[in-house]
Amino acid sequence: MIGKLTGTLLEKNPPEVLVDCHGVGYEVQVSMSTFYNLPAVGERVSLLTQFIVREDAQLLYGFGTAQERQAFRELIKISGVGPRTALSILSGMGVADLAQAVSLQEAGRLVKVPGIGKKTAERLLLELKGKLGADVGVRAHAANDNQADILQALLALGYNDKEAAAALKALPADVGVSEGIKLALKSLSK
């Protein structure tokens, strides 16, 4: 299996890039978020990869972060979601948005991605629950580190993602952690 490629970026044609690794050019499919974070053609690039073998093709998918690759791996385990659809989901919303949609059970956000219908969105929510990493979902709700700490505290106190996110939205953006927790608990007790 090919787990990582490091080499010179030769071509960028979304969603595909060509990476030269010691004289061998690898065609790699990437999500749009990874594509937009790539360096200029001719510069060094490093991509984490997932190698997929099918009857008719051997395909290489590249990712800028370990979280994106892990989300891709979880997505392709789901019935009805192949590599192309998984890449489309990651291109359409990114890992943090996907984790947030899953934690808040928002099928409507997934349906906005081309190729995802209502039934597939519901299946994604069901099968991805708890698999994308709690920290990614928590950080997706929070605008800054203080808000992330407040949200983490509310979750630790037993509030669910929806309740904690709603309480967080009601807080001023510049609130401190201890004051934010007090205000959030007050709003949740109503």
Swiss-Prot record:
Transmembrane segments: none annotated. SUPFAM superfamilies: DNA helicase RuvA subunit, C-terminal domain, Nucleic acid-binding proteins, RuvA domain 2-like. It is found in: Cytoplasm. GO terms for cellular component: cytoplasm; Holliday junction helicase complex; Holliday junction resolvase complex. InterPro entries: DNA_helicase_Holl-junc_RuvA_I, Hlx-hairpin-Hlx_DNA-bd_motif, NA-bd_OB-fold, RuvA, RuvA_2-like, RuvA_C, RuvA_C_sf. One of its GO terms (molecular function) is four-way junction DNA binding. Pfam families: HHH_5, RuvA_C, RuvA_N. Residues 1-64 are annotated as: Domain I. It comes from the Bacteria. CDD domains: UBA_RuvA_C. Residues 142-190 are annotated as: Domain III. Gene3D superfamilies: 5' to 3' exonuclease, C-terminal subdomain, DNA helicase RuvA subunit, C-terminal domain, Nucleic acid-binding proteins. GO terms for biological process: DNA recombination; DNA repair. Residues 137-141 are annotated as: Flexible linker. Keywords: Cytoplasm, DNA damage, DNA recombination, DNA repair, DNA-binding. Residues 65-137 are annotated as: Domain II. Has three domains with a flexible linker between the domains II and III and assumes an 'L' shape. Domain III is highly mobile and contacts RuvB. Belongs to the RuvA family. The RuvA-RuvB-RuvC complex processes Holliday junction (HJ) DNA during genetic recombination and DNA repair, while the RuvA-RuvB complex plays an important role in the rescue of blocked DNA replication forks via replication fork reversal (RFR). RuvA specifically binds to HJ cruciform DNA, conferring on it an open structure. The RuvB hexamer acts as an ATP-dependent pump, pulling dsDNA into and through the RuvAB complex. HJ branch migration allows RuvC to scan DNA until it finds its consensus sequence, where it cleaves and resolves the cruciform DNA. Homotetramer. Forms an RuvA(8)-RuvB(12)-Holliday junction (HJ) complex. HJ DNA is sandwiched between 2 RuvA tetramers; dsDNA enters through RuvA and exits via RuvB. An RuvB hexamer assembles on each DNA strand where it exits the tetramer. Each RuvB hexamer is contacted by two RuvA subunits (via domain III) on 2 adjacent RuvB subunits; this complex drives branch migration. In the full resolvosome a probable DNA-RuvA(4)-RuvB(12)-RuvC(2) complex forms which resolves the HJ. This is Holliday junction branch migration complex subunit RuvA. It comes from Acidovorax sp. (strain JS42). The lineage of its organism: Bacteria, Pseudomonadati, Pseudomonadota, Betaproteobacteria, Burkholderiales.
